[in-house]
Amino acid sequence: MDILKDLTGITGAGFVTDDETVLSGYASDLSFSAGTKPEAEVCPDTTEEVSRIVKWANENNMPLIPVSSPVHLYGSTIPKQGGVIVNMRRFDEIYEIDTVNRFVRIGTGVSWEKLTAALREQGMRVILPLTPRSDRSVATDHLEREVTTSMVY
């Protein structure tokens, strides 16, 4: 099995890497959890590509670890037995901002920076986590249960 060749066949060139520097960054986070370095990182752009990656992983008995931000806190994205990081950063579209009902629909890779800028243009704002990082995805903060702040008057 040639991981890079197989995954490049799914996502196209430029969206799969086995670069040591990139992969080493996934072997730990801000927690005390121990882990190992993944074999590769792949960055799909469509749900069809994600589906094909999952099918490939099942056929090759390869663990997949989904991520959507560069920073993690609780060990949830550290590979325990190698595998492939599925980086969802390219899913960074804001699908809808509903100013009447006050909600948004976003992709898993949308960062706080992108969301707050888009909402500001609409005269809106979002309740942020206690210590937001502009490059961290909104989805990651919600999945990792980051505490949000609420103004009380």
Residue ranges and their predicted role:
Residues 65-66, 128:
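Short hydrophobic alpha-helical runs that function as membrane-insertion/retention elements
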Residues 67, 87, 107:
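Short beta-strand segments
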Residues 93-97, 106-153:
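FAD-binding subdomain of flavoenzyme oxidoreductases
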Residues 1-55, 59, 71-102, 131, ...:
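N-terminal flexible segment immediately upstream of the FAD-binding catalytic core
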Residues 62-63, 125:
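Residue-level detector of anion-binding/catalytic polar loops
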